[in-house]
Amino acid sequence: MTTDAPARTKRPERPQAILTVTATEAVTPNLIRITAGGEGFDAIKDNDATDKYVKIIFADPRHGLTPPYDLAALREHSPERLPRNRTYTVREMDRENRQLTIDFVVHGDEGIAGPWARTAAPGDTLVAMGAGGAYRPDPDAPWHLLIADHTAIPAVSSALEEMDAAATGHIIANVPHAENRLLPEVPAGMTVTWVDDDEALIAAVRDLDWAEGTPQVFAHGERETIKAIRRILKEREVPRESLSISAYWARGRAEDQFQAEKREPIGQID
């Protein structure tokens, strides 16, 4: 005797926030800050995480699509016209003025989001879905350890702005070139170590003088680098519940492939 398996329920499409760019700023040579808002802001489901992120939808202008996009129909009938999603940390969510700010790292003409940000101007449209996120600094943590590359600096900055002035710990960040190293005010009890590459980031974490007590750890960046850092944290016996750890990107992978690999062994960070 056989029975039919229950049909898999499709998740409803997330609401699309159709926003208008209101300001752009070249914060550093490789960082462009975009602020966007408007009536569509209310479609964003906000949260209190300091690492909150949104999915930004980029449609190929050659396809003549206008938002909101019927992603389900495009996926089924015209997959070649399907817009691309890119994940970005929200630098600031201004509920009162109904606008959000996102920092885009730009490296020439690479990718989709960076070139868009480089040419974006007030009046342009930005379509976003979200927000996600789960980390927020715990004021009761014995100390904090924040490990990041350039992609996670916006989340680190937001976390610092929410920390008590008496917070202690360490920030270790891989951001090449001094002109690109940007953080808000850091509590007096926290140290900041800047490095220029992933190997130096791993070494700095490995060589860190470990304080007493279990730290709350935020570690995000390139996938293989984060895997190496995870092994160090295991050696330090940091429990999983004290960790916010994941890859934001993978070297040699476009985001579409990177996101797909999250469900495969290569994409797992245990």
Pin down the residues of each PLM region.
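Extended, composition-driven regions rather than compact fold-specific motifs
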Residues: M1-D270
